[in-house]
Amino acid sequence: MNPELLPIIQLGNPTLRQKAAWVENIHDATIQQLIDDLIATVAKANGVGIASPQVAQSYRLFIVASRPNPRYPHAPEMEPTAMINPKIVGHSTEIVEGWEGCLSVPGIRGLVPRHQAIEVEYTDRYGNLQKQTLTDFVARIFQHEFDHLDGVLFIDRVESNLNTITEEEYQELVTKNTK
């Protein structure tokens, strides 16, 4: 079956605030189709990650798809990767702030503190357990998407309203910093 573009639900939809369900059968055709659909949806939306709850499918599953784009011109290039039933098993003490946005919270950016490095475990789409150390931008994507699985949005992590800007203001910052 061909991948389908799924509608991305927006802030206010109760699914975004729920704890997502464990994926019991990774090889289930519905889960495999959802993975393909999420990969197509995040690419079309020009995002760097998307979690299953963002398309109203409350499973512990997300895609990390880092690549340079107008919002993140310095993002590292990586293959879109399905991360199923993920866990953070360790993290650095170093916390770094970075601007985040979300396909489910359009028009707003927030300065969010995250661990600079994390040790993670997840099952890939083929049923293999993966263990990795992620750093910098990819670690930030993982932590952002992981939060979605517990009903947490990036705006919940912003420490002050002064650390919130519009997408337009953010684009001006990006443009200024890439010249």
UniProtKB/Swiss-Prot annotation:
Binds 1 Fe(2+) ion. GO terms for biological process: co-translational protein modification; translation. Fe cation binds at residues 102, 144, 148. It comes from the Bacteria. The active site is at residue 145. Its cofactor is Fe(2+). CDD domains: Pep_deformylase. Keywords: Hydrolase, Iron, Metal-binding, Protein biosynthesis. NCBIfam families: pept_deformyl (TIGR00079), PRK00150.1-3 (NF001159). Removes the formyl group from the N-terminal Met of newly synthesized proteins. Requires at least a dipeptide for an efficient rate of reaction. N-terminal L-methionine is a prerequisite for activity but the enzyme has broad specificity at other positions. This is Peptide deformylase 2. It comes from Nostoc sp. (strain PCC 7120 / SAG 25.82 / UTEX 2576). The gene is def2.
